[in-house]
Amino acid sequence: MASQKKVIVVESKSLFDKMLEDAGPNRHILVEFFATWCGPCAMIGPRLEQLAVEYNNRMIVMKIDVDENEELALQYEINSMPTFLIIKNRVTLVQFVGSNVSKVVSTVEKYVGKPDEVKDAKGKAAEGSGPQTVAKL
């Protein structure tokens, strides 16, 4: 089970729309627009898997292949890969380009918080990733 992938590969606009709806108003979504032929996209993949685990209860991590989902690529005006978005409550908070792992991590921390800042519903530090966690704003 430890090898199970946490990053969701979005294969259609309808699945993307459903994921936005399912995330609700409090959960962030990190989206990577990528291409299978994009070397830097492949290089950052393992770190995205780590982020998906570290932020399991607060952020959904998904990947969208621009060649398979042209409508979404056009909707978000994707011109370079990888392009990342952080979305919350259907609103794009930030969009940036590049495979710099440090930039991706620091941007996630800026908008979502650090993984160790997970709090339970009573405001106490949670033990790992319990089911009653909320993002520190």
Task: State each model region's role.
Residues 15, 43, 47-50, 91, ...:
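Acidic, Ser/Thr-rich intrinsically disordered and amphipathic helical segments
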Residues 9-28, 70:
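A short beta-strand-turn-helix
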Residues 79-80, 85-121:
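Non-catalytic, surface beta->alpha helical segment in thiol-disulfide oxidoreductase systems
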Residues 38-41:
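Hydrophobic heptad-repeat coiled-coil signature
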Residues 112-137:
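Non-globular targeting/processing and membrane-anchoring segments
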Residues 15, 35-36, 68, 89-91, ...:
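Conserved beta-strand elements of beta-rich interaction domains across eukaryotes
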Residues 10-12, 33, 44-71, 78-81:
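Thiol-based oxidoreductase modules, predominantly thioredoxin-like and allied folds used
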Residues 1-6:
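N-proximal helix/coil linker or "cap" segments that precede and/or mark the start of modular domains
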